[in-house]
Every structure is written in structure tokens, then in C-alpha cells.
A protein has these predicted regions:
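Flavin-dependent oxidoreductase catalytic core characteristic
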Residues: 1-149
Length: 149
């Protein structure tokens, strides 16, 4: 955001350009999603370590889901952030170029999307993780979120 507020192109700040604002939102939304899911997963971990079986089952489905989504989105977010910064985002004096490289490594280290999908299926079939996820989502979402009366 600092770059968008301060960098001037064609006589206007980047943040004042409608297409740039749209791109910023496309950076911010998945970032906030990953942060929110990280907190939800951390809470499940705390409760699982305190002995909650439901939290342990929830943790089994949240962990691979978070790994998949956050590492996949990180590549796009970092690429868009580098683009937003322009050429200065590419040079090594700023973290953006390193973050982009690290984002690609994240999905490699955490396993391919197919392996992560198999882990989710294992959690559902063997550990009842879906039964733990459903009430968690119901508590977080409005009653009519899925068009039900």
C-alpha cells in the first residue's frame, strides 16, 4: 500500500488509478483469506493440544487446505505485488523478488496439489474431519449463506 500511495505515474498516484485499485484488491483479498484461515487453524491447534478430539479432526482438514490455498495464492499475490512496484520490485534491494521466489518454493515443499488433495480425502475418510468442519463453518456463516431458508 505504501508504494501505491506514494508512487506517481502519469502525474497521478497509483492508488488513484481505478485499474491499480482493482489489482490491489486482488492482492489484499487472498492475503486476508490466508491470514484468517491461519488464525482459525492456529485456534484448532491450541484446542487439539488441550485435548479436544473435534479440534484435532478439524485441524486435520484445515492444515492441508490452508497449505494448498495459501501457497497457491502466494504465487499470484507476489507476482501482482512485484508488478505493482514496477522495475523497482524486481531488484534485490527490496523483498518482493525474494518473496516471489519463496512463494514458488512453498507449493513445492508443501507437496503438489494432488498430494494435498489426497491428504484432505484421507482426513475426511479416516478421521471424520468433515464432521468437524461443518459445525465450524455453520457457526461462522449466516444461516442463509447457502440459499437455505
Amino acid at each position: 500500500m505504501t508504494v501505491a500511495r506514494n508512487r506517481v505515474v502519469f502525474g497521478r498516484r497509483i492508488i488513484d488509478l481505478p485499474l491499480a485499485r482493482r489489482q490491489l484488491m486482488k492482492i489484499m483479498l487472498p492475503t486476508e483469506q490466508a491470514l484468517s484461515m491461519s488464525f482459525l487453524t492456529a485456534d484448532a491447534l491450541d484446542r487439539a493440544e488441550a485435548g479436544s478430539q473435534d479440534a484435532a479432526a478439524l485441524l486435520r482438514i484445515l492444515t492441508p487446505t490452508l497449505k494448498f490455498r495459501a501457497t497457491r495464492d502466494a504465487r499470484k499475490v507476489c507476482g501482482d505485488a512485484l508488478e505493482m512496484r514496477g522495475g523497482i520490485g524486481y531488484i534485490e534491494e527490496f523483498a518482493t523478488a525474494r518473496l516471489l521466489r519463496d512463494a514458488h518454493l512453498g507449493s513445492i515443499w508443501e507437496g503438489t496439489s494432488n498430494v494435498v488433495a489426497l491428504d484432505v480425502m484421507r482426513a475426511i475418510r479416516r478421521e471424520g474431519a468433515l464432521d468437524a468442519l461443518e459445525p465450524t463453518l455453520e457457526a461462522m456463516l449466516p444461516k442463509d449463506a447457502f440459499g437455505e431458508a
